[in-house]
Swiss-Prot record:
The keyword Chaperone applies. CDD domains: RecA-like_HslU. NCBIfam families: hslU (TIGR00390), PRK05201.1 (NF003544). GO terms for molecular function: ATP binding; ATP hydrolysis activity; peptidase activity; proteasome-activating activity. ATP binds at I18, G60, V61, G62, K63, T64, E65, D256, E321, R393. It comes from the Bacteria. It comes from Shigella dysenteriae serotype 1 (strain Sd197). InterPro entries: AAA+_ATPase, ATP-dep_Clp_protease_ClpX, ATPase_AAA_core, Clp_ATPase_C, HslU, P-loop_NTPase. ATPase subunit of a proteasome-like degradation complex; this subunit has chaperone activity. The binding of ATP and its subsequent hydrolysis by HslU are essential for unfolding of protein substrates subsequently hydrolyzed by HslV. HslU recognizes the N-terminal part of its protein substrates and unfolds these before they are guided to HslV for hydrolysis. It is found in: Cytoplasm. One of its GO terms (cellular component) is HslUV protease complex. This is ATP-dependent protease ATPase subunit HslU. HAMAP family: HslU. Induction: By heat shock.
Length: 443
């Protein structure tokens, strides 16, 4: 689990997301509170429940990006789901309990990677011994059994030294490795994913673990042997329990597009993919026990972060019980021209940096001037205002149109320097931006 302070979390998010300070602060505090809770005594820790967050803001302002970046920072089980993919229990489609099952699967993978990393040093030693056994087979007695030598032979030590120095990396050897499990693809109807995964694991376990002789270079064999030996050192039952504990104590669920499951107007039929989903979400958010293939998981202390544009619906259109379970409201602001300018230049891997790197592979040096950046930002903002406001995503559309000619001719422009200034942008975009009909379909 991450031990970063709220200030450090916000600072890390600032490297990728421009503006939206309130949302960053709320998420940072919620993440830090997970750590604070774990420092309490067990009795009080059980009483402290997470304060779930509802992020409200137009499309393209950074709601989903905050979730993506948070997943990398949290060092805790985190899953992002779309609210529109679920239906009420009993109808065709995924039920909301599958959120917790997927979160537990993600936790098992995360804990397994950590356990393998922890045992890597020992796994490297065992892998090294197996390769040395192939290069210099151990001595055998009259009954064909391997004799245990007190001290490794001089030849074995010499080969060990060469192996560690990489002198034998390209030498080919034949070695026995665990055969890949039998793959069985099962097509199941929506909502039956749990049964499908259980059937697949059952088929994979048929016939036990088989060994298969493979001819590989030593450097490739070493990688596979390290993975195999590390997996043997991991206790599966302990791993499952650690994963369930991680989900229950540190799990985070990010539910996107929650505004799309709000009830709109009066309808006579059953609303299985809107209000029905909200009702099914209630016990998860409030706290219940969900059955997964790894064991029973309690959701009492899982943090839920929901987000939605709420352009048609309003937060008050959510059923009152769900509103009460999302006590922290954060409003994200629409982006301005200056925000667009910062998005084009400040993030670590901004769009302009990406385009420059892509063109550099063809030997073309692209330079964006300040005036060019400003004009691109103005064009994107202008199109957003005159057509549909899709936030920062408009920058991708505008830049792709601007760079189309250079991208097409890049292989013929090798060694050239191209400067993209205000005049260049105006020449290529002004006609499109000014014509509302054209910009509606092209930008």
């Amino acid at each position: 689990m991450s031990e970063m302070t709220p200030r450090e979390i916000v600072s890390e998010l600032d490297k990728h997301i421009i503006g939206q300070d309130n949302a960053k602060r709320s998420v940072a505090i919620a993440l830090r509170n997970r750590w604070r809770r774990m420092q309490l005594n067990e009795e009080l820790r059980h009483e402290v429940t997470p304060k779930n967050i509802l992020m409200i803001g137009p499309t393209g302002v950074g709601k989903t990006e905050i979730a993506r970046r948070l997943a990398k920072l949290a060092n805790a089980p985190l899953i992002k789901v779309e609210a529109t993919k679920f239906t009420e229990v009993g109808y065709v489609g995924k039920e909301v309990d599958s959120i917790i099952r997927d979160l537990t699967d993600a936790a098992v993978k995360m804990v397994r990677v950590q356990a393998i990393e922890k045992n890597r040093y020992r796994a490297e030693e065992l892998a090294e011994e197996r390769i040395l056994d192939v290069l210099i087979p151990p001595a055998k007695n009259n009954w064909g059994q391997t004799e245990q030598q007190q001290e490794p032979s001089a030849a074995r030590q010499a080969f060990r030294k060469k192996l560690r120095e990489g002198q034998l990396d390209d030498k080919e050897i034949e070695i026995d490795l665990a055969a890949a499990p039998m793959g069985v693809e099962i097509m199941a109807p929506p909502g039956m994913e749990e049964m499908t995964s259980q059937l697949q694991s059952m088929f994979q376990n048929l016939g036990g673990q088989k060994q298969k002789a493979r001819k590989l270079k030593i450097k490739d064999a070493m990688k596979l042997l390290i993975e195999e030996e590390a997996a043997k050192l991991v206790n599966p039952e302990e791993l499952k329990q650690d994963a369930i504990d991680a989900v229950e104590q540190h799990g985070i669920v990010f539910i996107d597009e929650i505004d799309k499951i709000c009830k709109r107007g009066e309808s006579s039929g059953p609303d299985v993919s809107r209000e029905g989903v909200q009702r099914d979400l209630l016990p998860l958010v409030e706290g219940c026990t969900v059955s997964t293939k790894h064991g029973m998981v309690k959701t009492d202390h899982i943090l839920f972060i929901a987000s939605g544009a709420f352009q048609i619906a309003k937060p008050s259109d959510l059923i009152p019980e769900l509103q009460g379970r999302l006590p922290i409201r954060v409003e994200l602001q629409a982006l301005t021209t200056s925000d667009f300018e910062r998005i084009l230049t400040e993030p670590n891997a901004s769009i302009t940096v990406q385009y420059k790197a892509l063109m550099a592979t063809e030997g073309v040096n692209i330079e964006f001037t300040d005036s060019g950046i400003k004009r691109i930002a103005e064009a994107a903002w202008q199109v957003n205002e005159s057509t549909e406001n899709i936030g920062a995503r408009r920058l991708h559309t505008v830049l792709e149109r601007l760079m189309e000619e250079i991208s097409y001719d890049a292989s013929d422009l090798s060694g050239q320097n191209i400067t993209i200034d205000a005049d260049y942008v105006s020449k290529h975009l002004d006609a499109l931006v000014a014509d509302e009909d054209l910009s509606r379909f092209i930008l």
